[in-house]
Regions:
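Glycine-rich FAD pyrophosphate-binding loop
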Residues: 7, 23-43
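Residue-level detector of alpha-helix initiation sites
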Residues: 12-13, 37-38, 112
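FAD/FMN-dependent oxidoreductases across multiple families
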Residues: 137, 153, 236-321, 327
Length: 410
C-alpha cells in the first residue's frame, strides 16, 4: 500500500489543476484516473476567459506551453440568437485591443486540453500520476482514508474528489444528488465544413422557442471543424419527452438560420450524450479531510453550461485549502468550511445570477418580446459585453425596470 498526503481522484481539469497547485508547495500527492490520455471527453470545447486567467495565475509558462502545443482558437464573443431569430453579436470585450486586454476565450478540443494538463502533471509527478486506475471504493482509515483502486490501495490524509459528474464509487462522505432541475442533459457532435462561422470565432448560442430554457450551439474549432450540440434542463427533457439528438438534427435540417450553412457539411461521428451538474449552493462540498471539486461539486454554470473554468478554479482553491490544512495541522469539519466559503465568494455571485437568468428563460413569450424590442437598439451589445466583465452589470440585467429603461431608450 502506498501512502501520501493528498489523493486526487480524477485527472480532468479540476484534478490536474489541484495537482499542479499542490506541487508548487511541495505537498505530496497521488492523482488517479480510470482513463488513459489522450481520451475523448464529451464537451462543447468552448473555454471562457476564466481558463487563461487561472492557468496564468498558476504559471504563465504553463499558459504559454498550452497555447504553443494545443493551438487553441481565440474566440472574441458570442452570437446570441433569440426566439424569433433575432441575432445579437456580443463581443466579450468591447473595442478589444490585444496589447491591453487578456485573451477573451478559447475553443479547443477537450481531448487536447485534458491531455496537455495530464502531461504537465506527469512531468512533475512521474509515477504519482496513475492512469488506467479506477477508484472502486473509499473507507475511513485511522488518520485519513484508504482508497481501493484497480492498481492497489492508497492511504491518504486527505482527498480531493474531482471525479466528475458520472463517478460511481462508494465514499464515506456525502456526494450531491443530481436533482433533475439542477441537471442539464446535452449531446454534442463534430462537423466539418459548416459555412458562415464568425470571422472572430464568436461562439453561437441559439435560444430557440421550443428548447428554452436550453440552447442549441455552434462552436467553431481549429482545422475547419465545429462542435455542434444542444443542452436542456433534465426536468424539461423528461416532462416534454425530448429526444435531444432528434431535435438537434431537426434544427440542422430546418432552422432557416442554420440549415443553409450545413448543406455541404459532413458530420464526423455519432452524437454523444452526457449530463451537466448545474451549480447548487445548497450542497456541502467539503468536510473532515475531504473536498469536492469541479463537476463532482456541481459547479457548472446553470445558464451557459460552462464547467471547465469552474473546475480549474475549484481545483486551485481546493489545493490551497489543503496547503492550509497541512500548515495548520487542521483537517476537521470546522476548518474545512473555509473551502466552501471561498468557492462561494469566487463563484457564488455569478452562479446565482445565472440561475435567475435561466429561470427567466422559462417564459418564451417574454424573451421574444424583449428580443424584438432589443433588435437594433444600439445600447444592447455594449451592455451585454459588460455582462462578461462586470458582475454588477449582469445583476442589473435582471432588474425589469432597468431592462425596460434600456429597451425604451433606442
Ligand atoms: C455535452 C457537454 C458540453 C459541455 N460544454 C462545455 C463547454 O463548452 N465549456 C465548458 O467550460 N464546459 C462544458 N461542459 C462542462 C465540462 O465538460 C465539465 O464541467 C468539466 O469537464 C468538469 O471538469 P472536472 O475536472 O470536474 O470533471 P471531468 O472533466 O469529468 O474529469 C473527471 C475525471 O475523473 C475520472 N474518474 C471518474 N470516475 C473515476 C473513478 N472511479 N476512478 C478514477 N477516475 C475516475 C474520469 O475519467 C475523468 O477523467 C460541457 C459538458 C457536457 C456534458
Amino acid at each position: 500500500m502506498q501512502s501520501t498526503s493528498v489523493c486526487i481522484i480524477g485527472a480532468g481539469p479540476g484534478g490536474t489543476m489541484a495537482a499542479l497547485r499542490l506541487a508548487k508547495d511541495n505537498i505530496p500527492f497521488v492523482i488517479v484516473d480510470k482513463d488513459e490520455f489522450p481520451r475523448e471527453k464529451i464537451c462543447g470545447d468552448a473555454l471562457s476567459g476564466k481558463v487563461p486567467h487561472i492557468i496564468r495565475r498558476l504559471s504563465p509558462e504553463i499558459l504559454e506551453r498550452f497555447e504553443e502545443k494545443c493551438k487553441p482558437m481565440h474566440s472574441f464573443g458570442i452570437r446570441f440568437i433569440a426566439p424569433g431569430n433575432y441575432v445579437f453579436d456580443v463581443p466579450f470585450i468591447e473595442n478589444y485591443n490585444a496589447e491591453k486586454h487578456p485573451v477573451p476565450g478559447y475553443t479547443v478540443k477537450r481531448k487536447l486540453l485534458d491531455a496537455f494538463m495530464v502531461e504537465e502533471v506527469s512531468n512533475i509527478a512521474g509515477e504519482k500520476l496513475m492512469t488506467a486506475c479506477t477508484v472502486m471504493s473509499i473507507e475511513k482509515g485511522e488518520d485519513g482514508f484508504i482508497i481501493d483502486t484497480s492498481s492497489g490501495q492508497i492511504q491518504a490524509k486527505m482527498i480531493i474528489d474531482a471525479s466528475g459528474a458520472a463517478s460511481s464509487f462508494k465514499a464515506p462522505y456525502p456526494k450531491p444528488e443530481p436533482e433533475p432541475k439542477k441537471t442539464a442533459l446535452a449531446v454534442r457532435t463534430y462537423y466539418k465544413g459548416v459555412k458562415g462561422l464568425h470571422p472572430e470565432n464568436f461562439i453561437e448560442l441559439y435560444f430557440l422557442e421550443n428548447i428554452l430554457p436550453g440552447y442549441f450551439w455552434i462552436f467553431p474549432l481549429p482545422d475547419g471543424l465545429a462542435n455542434i450540440g444542444i443542452g436542456i434542463r433534465k426536468d424539461v427533457v423528461l416532462k416534454k419527452k425530448i429526444n435531444l439528438s432528434a431535435v438537434m438534427d431537426e434544427i440542422i435540417r430546418n432552422n432557416p438560420l442554420v440549415s443553409p450553412r450545413f448543406r455541404d457539411a459532413e458530420r464526423l461521428g455519432k452524437p454523444a450524450a452526457c449530463r451537466l451538474p448545474l451549480g447548487n449552493p445548497r450542497f456541502r462540498i467539503a468536510g473532515e479531510r475531504y473536498m469536492l471539486a469541479g463537476d463532482a461539486a456541481h459547479l457548472v454554470d446553470p445558464l451557459t453550461g460552462e464547467g471547465v473554468g469552474n473546475a480549474l478554479y475549484s481545483g486551485f482553491i481546493a489545493a490551497e485549502q489543503a496547503i492550509d490544512c497541512f500548515n495548520e495541522n487542521r483537517f476537521d469539519d470546522a476548518f474545512m468550511l473555509a473551502y466552501g466559503q471561498r468557492i462561494r465568494r469566487v463563484l457564488g455571485k455569478e452562479m446565482s445570477i445565472s440561475t435567475n437568468f435561466q429561470k427567466m428563460l422559462k417564459y418564451p413569450r417574454m424573451v421574444k418580446w424583449i428580443a424584438k424590442r432589443a433588435d437594433g437598439n444600439k445600447h444592447i451589445p455594449g451592455l451585454m459585453s459588460s455582462m462578461f466583465t462586470d458582475l454588477d452589470h449582469r445583476k442589473k440585467l435582471l432588474n425589469p425596470i432597468f431592462i425596460l429603461r434600456v429597451l425604451m431608450n433606442r
